[in-house]
Amino acid sequence: PNKALITGFWSKVKVDEVGAEALGRLLVVYPWTQRFFEHFGDLSTADAVLGNAKVKAHGKKVLDSFSNGVQHLDDLKGTFAQLSELHCDKLHVDPENFRLLGNVLVVVLARHFGKEFTPELQAEFQKVVAGVASALAHRYH
């Protein structure tokens, strides 16, 4: 991936907003992913999900972690080793969900940045989200 392009763009991302929306959209668009978040309270409608404080907080946490990955693009596997262990061994999250969240993140970035999120930038971010998803799924292999 083009590190300079990615890190330069990422510095403009409002992690709390984008993270909250990305996780919220994942739970709405792919409702079966909600089973990992049943303890978050009301997830019965799109408005409930997107307004849920626990969803917002976890979305920020997810994107803070992704930000850390953006700073360590050469070692995604090492960067996400502990999170991979947690999500795979303890939470038993289907690794496909990591790919889905990555794709939702790209949609949210496009929504927030419009024309600034060029096809070239999208291509770079698809590589990054694929790399992060692969690193998170590492414990399954």
Curated annotation (Swiss-Prot):
Red blood cells. Gene3D superfamilies: Globins. This type of beta-C chain is found when anemia has been experimentally produced. Involved in oxygen transport from the lung to the various peripheral tissues. This is Hemoglobin subunit beta-C. The keyword Transmembrane helix does not apply. Heterotetramer of two alpha chains and two beta chains. Belongs to the globin family. PANTHER family: HEMOGLOBIN FAMILY MEMBER, HEMOGLOBIN SUBUNIT BETA. One of its GO terms (molecular function) is peroxidase activity. GO terms for cellular component: blood microparticle; haptoglobin-hemoglobin complex; hemoglobin complex. Heme b binds at residues 58, 87. It comes from the Eukaryota. Residues 1-141 form the Globin domain. InterPro entries: Globin, Globin-like_sf, Globin/Proto, Hemoglobin_b, Hemoglobin_oxygen_transport. Coiled coil: none annotated. Keywords: Heme, Iron, Metal-binding, Oxygen transport, Transport. It comes from Ovis aries musimon (Mouflon).
